[in-house]
From Swiss-Prot:
Keywords: Cell inner membrane, Cell membrane, Ion transport, Membrane, Potassium, Potassium transport, Symport, Transmembrane, Transmembrane helix, Transport. GO terms for molecular function: potassium ion transmembrane transporter activity; symporter activity. Coiled coil: none annotated. This is Probable potassium transport system protein Kup. The chain crosses the membrane at residues 20-40, 60-80, 111-131, 146-166, 178-198, 216-236, 257-277, 289-309, 347-367, 379-399, 404-424, 429-449. It comes from the Bacteria. GO terms for cellular component: plasma membrane.
Length: 632
């Protein structure tokens, strides 16, 4: 009986591990898994001048192989995935870790925040480029099957992409269950096509020798660094391994990489290389020309599904990043809609969705081909990778306390490779790479303005503020009329009297029997346990101070959290509790702290941001807002 039970539990564990691995393949590896569609095509037809001959093909294959091994296998799987913030990954989670690591060094902490914002800004640019270049590259395969259909590539791609964005608000819970099996099928097909190609020209297996990569740099010194700008296309999506860690955990992501994804990618790239050795003209689209003629149309269909799944993963990643950034105070509050009753992580943010859709449509119309878009792709990818390395450097040295003699050589290796890839893409800024730079610059400006504006706003509100003990003392001297019920005043400063409370006293000249000064604290960790959710302090005379702590992945539901507050005499009965909010109207001035044009920008962002009412899930019929004007 016991033995049978243990076998059953072991079988259930194995089944769960396998299902997690398949799910990880469907979500995490869509982007990097569709890179074979365009990487070698861009290398040999992207204007780099790489000769399609024996040494050129083997040199490029060796560069791709060892880039995958160093950047993805070594850097991300072995190191970056260990830099989790209580299980969560991604740019914002890593920025929160780096902030914690550099807390004793204010200037270094500011630098880490800037690097985090740059990385996040470039990720949004990547979130527009990935759907455009992936779907275009898949649909372009139809041009090989049908003559004269090339002019339909852009319209068909637009239909697919617009449909993808239109269904976002309905969620992908049901169809999402198919993502894993479809992507597993995709990788099996990649591997099979690769084996088919290699069998016709096993000579390509020599590229496992890194000497061919070194030889390429020696023979083509002027082209060596520049070609890395195309080779990096094989690494697009590496950041997703870290960004999606919170959904699956480090082990399933690592196992999926080594067991399926890496072998399939290497086999396919080498198979394409084998075809190029046999027929240099195949450089116009080596991926599709690797397939037998009868398999071309089914392959186009499968590739289109794979690229849609890759695009979905990036879009979902943008939603998740936005929620984290909102909680950490880097982005104005937006309405977050949950699309699944079971999965808390499945969310929809309309403003992000429509912004991404407009960007993707403009990219497809403006660039018209995956090859033209490739230049823009590399800048966003390498910039994000470089920022991740800088952030993890602070974590390794200051938080993990790794010995410098061990950490510094590894970090120098990471920074050197990332720096070379980024430098190779800098010249592409004038060839189309300006898009992610401009998009990232605009987003960085918005996020930094919002963060700085909120800091100044709190400082201005605090100026001349009345300390809470002084206010309570005055109440004891001249007691106002008290009414039944609980008044909750939201305030950023728990030690000062909120403006809403002062205005309420001034205009209504009454106080509730219980007055709660509530401060919501956003933590640099993803989730806060319920037992650590609140701090309560009683001041006497019916005054209480409550601090509610939320992580950047928590839902800041204030009424639900207040139900957990247990203190004698403190009553949060819904129909006896009224929430008082301050609604600030910002006026840009010439006061120190922020230039006037940025002050106007912050005022615009504040005016259009979601208020505390919706963000904290406050009951609409129990909220009173009191306005105030603030100069910044």
């Amino acid at each position: 009986m016991v033995q049978a039970s243990s076998h059953a539990e072991g079988g259930q564990g194995a089944t769960r591990s396998l299902s997690l691995l398949v799910a990880a393949v469907g979500v995490v590896y869509g982007d990097i898994g569709t890179s074979p569609l365009y990487t070698l095509k861009e290398v040999f037809t992207g204007g780099y001048g790489v000769p399609v001959n024996h040494d050129g093909v083997l040199g490029i294959l060796s560069l791709i192989l060892w880039s995958l091994l160093w950047v993805v296998s070594f850097k991300y799987v072995m190191f970056i995935l260990r830099a989790d913030n209580q299980g969560e990954g991604g740019t914002m989670a890593l920025t929160a870790l780096a902030r914690r690591a550099t807390a004793a060094y204010p200037r270094l902490r500011t630098l880490m925040v800037i690097c985090g914002l740059i990385g996040a800004s470039l990720f949004y640019g990547d979130s527009m480029i990935t759907p455009a270049v992936s779907v275009l590259s898949a649909v372009e395969g139809m041009g090989l099957a049908f003559d004269g259909i090339d002019h339909w590539v852009v319209p068909i791609s637009l239909v697919v992409l617009v449909a993808l964005f239109l269904v976002q608000k309905h969620g992908t819970e049901k169809i999402g269950k198919l993502f894993g099996p479809i992507m597993v099928t995709w990788f099996v097909v990649l591997a099979a096509l690769g084996v088919h190609g290699i069998s016709q020209s096993p000579e390509v297996l020599k590229a496992f020798n890194p000497g061919w990569a070194v030889n390429f740099f020696i023979v083509h010194p002027g082209m060596g660094v520049a070609i890395l700008g195309a080779v990096v296309l094989a690494l697009t999506g590496a950041e997703a391994l870290y960004a999606d860690m919170g959904h699956f955990g480090r082990k399933p992501i690592a196992r999926a990489w080594f067991a399926l994804v890496l072998p399939a990618l290497v086999l396919n790239y080498f198979g394409q290389g084998a075809i190029l050795l046999q027929n240099p003209d195949a450089a116009r689209n080596p991926f599709y020309l690797l397939a037998p003629g009868w398999a071309l149309l089914p392959l186009v269909g499968l590739a289109t599904m794979a690229t849609v799944i890759a695009s979905q993963a990036v879009i979902s990643g943008a939603f998740s990043l936005t929620r984290q950034a909102i909680q950490l105070g880097y982005i104005p509050r937006m309405h977050i809609q949950h699309t699944s009753s079971d999965e808390q992580g499945q969310i929809y943010i309309a403003a992000v969705n429509w912004t991404l859709m407009v960007g993707v449509v403009l990219l497809v119309i403006g660039f018209e081909s995956s090859g033209a878009l490739a230049a823009a792709y590399g800048v966003a990818v390498t910039g994000t990778m470089l920022m991740t390395t800088i952030l993890v450097s602070a974590v390794m040295l200051l938080l993990w306390k790794w010995p410098p003699v061990l950490a510094v050589p590894i970090l120098i290796g990471f920074l050197l490779v990332d720096g070379l890839f980024f430098a190779a893409n800098v010249p592409k800024i004038v060839q189309g790479g300006a898009f992610p730079v401009l998009a990232g610059g605009v987003l960085f400006l918005l996020m930094s303005t919002w963060k700085r504006g909120k800091q100044i706003l709190v400082e201005r509100i605090d100026e001349g503020g009345l300390p809470l003990p002084v206010f309570i003392s005055s109440i004891r001297i001249q007691p106002p009329h008290r009414v039944e019920g609980t008044a909750v005043f939201l305030t950023a400063r728990p030690d000062a009297v909120p403006h809403a409370l002062l205005h309420n006293m001034l205009h209504n000249q009454v106080l509730h029997s219980q007055v709660v000064l509530l401060t919501v604290v956003s933590e640099d960790r993803p989730r806060v346990p319920e037992q650590e959710r609140f701090e309560v302090e009683a001041y006497g005379d019916g005054f209480f101070r409550v601090l509610l702590h939320f992580g950047f992945m928590d839902e800041p539901d204030v009424p639900a959290a207040l139900k957990l507050c247990h203190l004698d005499g403190l009553d949060f009965t819904p129909m006896r509790t009224t929430y008082f909010l301050s609604r600030e109207t910002v006026i840009a001035s010439r006061l120190e702290g922020m230039s006037r044009w940025r002050g106007n920008l912050f005022a615009f962002l504040l005016k259009n941001a979601n208020g505390n009412l919706r963000f904290f899930n406050l009951p609409l019929n129990r909220v009173i807002e009191l306005g105030t004007q603030v100069e910044i």
